[in-house]
Structure formats: structure tokens, C-alpha cells
UniProtKB/Swiss-Prot annotation:
Transmembrane segments: 27-47
One GO cellular component term noted in the UniProt record for this chain: plasma membrane
Originating species: Maricaulis maris (strain MCS10)
Name listed for the protein in its UniProt record: ATP synthase subunit b 2
Subcellular location: Cell inner membrane
Entry keyword annotation includes tRNA processing: no
UniProt keyword Cell inner membrane present: yes
Domain of life: Bacteria
Pfam families found in the cross-reference section: ATP-synt_B
Function in brief: F(1)F(0) ATP synthase produces ATP from ADP in the presence of a proton or sodium gradient. F-type ATPases consist of two structural domains, F(1) containing the extramembraneous catalytic core and F(0) containing the membrane proton channel, linked together by a central stalk and a peripheral stalk. During catalysis, ATP synthesis in the catalytic domain of F(1) is coupled via a rotary mechanism of the central stalk subunits to proton translocation.
Bilayer topology annotation: Single-pass membrane protein
HAMAP family for this protein: ATP_synth_b_bprime (MF_01398)
InterPro entries linked: ATP_synth_b/b'su_bac/chlpt, ATP_synthase_B_chain
Subunit description: F-type ATPases have 2 components, F(1) - the catalytic core - and F(0) - the membrane proton channel. F(1) has five subunits: alpha(3), beta(3), gamma(1), delta(1), epsilon(1). F(0) has three main subunits: a(1), b(2) and c(10-14). The alpha and beta chains form an alternating ring which encloses part of the gamma chain. F(1) is attached to F(0) by a central stalk formed by the gamma and epsilon chains, while a peripheral stalk is formed by the delta and b chains.
Upper taxonomic lineage: Bacteria, Pseudomonadati, Pseudomonadota, Alphaproteobacteria, Maricaulales
């Protein structure tokens, strides 16, 4: 593209690029010019057709998605009705099961109460028997401890109050008594 120099103010002809290069220019002017060139290239390459086709394809896709959504909504409504019907049937069945379970629970409760009473009676009897055994054992232990304590006390008394000669006499007397008992 040629530009007359008179328009540019020089008096000779220049190309547009020469004229632009000679401009001491404003950067915003060059940015605007670059933008125009960029858009011109895009139009030349047919980008607008590609964009239009993409938008048309997108619109068709959205239309298809809306149709699919409508179909899915109808299917969902049918499924909801089916599930509500099944839920009502399940609730009726559950009520019947609950009634049967209550009846069985009552009989199991009575049986468990009877078993518990029997177990409690057996455990009470066993506990009473153990207590009686423990009492007998305790009485025997007390008697043994008392006898041992009495023997120790007697030994201490004898040691402190009797002389050695008296002790020998007692031992001799006990030996005679043991001898007589053995015969």
C-alpha cells in the first residue's frame, strides 16, 4: 500500500510501513494498529467461521443435553412412583414383621425371666453352701488358732511360774500317763 508523501508531509511517496516507521509515534497507536492487523489475519484465516461452527455445535449440544435431561426427568418421575409404591409395600411388611417380633419378644422375655429365676435360685443355693463352708472353715481355723494360742500361753505360764525341778516332775507324770494309756 502506498501513501502519498504530501499526506505525510514530506513531498515524496512512501510505503505504509516506511511511513509508520518514520512516525515518532504514540505506542497506543502501534498497539491499535497491531490489533487491527491481528483481527485482519483472523478474518483472512476464517476464524470467524470456526467460531460460528463451534457456537452452533455448542448450541446443538445444549439442545441435546436439554432433551436428555427431560428424558431423565421423566424416567426419574417413573422411578419415584415405583419406589414410593415399593416403600408402601415395605412399610406394610415391616409392620407385620414388627407385630410378629413383639409377640416373639414377649415369649422370649417370659422364657428368659424363668431361666433367670432358676439361675438365681441355683446361684443363691451355691452361695449359701459356700458361706456355710466358709463359716465351718472359719470356726475350725478359730478353734485351731485358739488351741495354739492356749498352748503358747500355757507354755509361757509354765516357763515363768514353774521351776526346772517342777517341770521335770510334770514331764515324768505325763510320761507315766502316756505309758498307762498306751497299755
Amino acid at each position: 500500500m502506498m501513501i502519498r508523501a504530501e499526506d505525510a508531509g514530506h513531498g515524496e511517496e512512501q510505503t505504509l510501513l516506511e511511513w509508520l516507521a518514520a512516525q515518532p509515534g504514540d505506542p497506543s497507536f502501534y498497539a491499535f494498529l497491531a490489533l487491527l492487523i491481528f483481527f485482519g489475519l483472523l478474518l483472512h484465516m476464517g476464524v470467524h467461521r470456526t467460531i460460528a461452527k463451534t457456537l452452533d455445535d455448542r448450541a446443538e449440544g445444549i439442545s441435546n443435553e436439554l432433551d436428555e435431561a427431560k428424558r431423565l426427568r421423566e424416567d426419574a418421575a417413573e422411578m419415584l412412583a415405583s419406589y414410593q409404591r415399593k416403600q408402601r409395600e415395605a412399610e406394610a411388611e415391616a409392620e407385620a414383621i414388627i407385630a410378629q417380633a413383639k409377640t416373639e419378644a414377649k415369649s422370649l422375655k417370659a422364657e428368659a425371666r424363668k431361666e433367670m429365676t432358676e439361675r438365681l435360685e441355683r446361684r443363691t443355693a451355691m452361695a449359701e453352701q459356700r458361706i456355710a463352708q466358709a463359716e465351718a472353715q472359719a470356726a475350725a481355723d478359730v478353734k485351731a488358732a485358739a488351741a495354739e494360742l492356749a498352748a503358747q500361753a500355757a507354755e509361757e505360764i509354765l516357763k515363768t511360774q514353774l521351776k526346772k525341778s517342777d517341770l521335770n516332775k510334770l514331764v515324768d507324770a505325763d510320761i507315766k500317763t502316756v505309758g498307762q494309756r498306751l497299755n
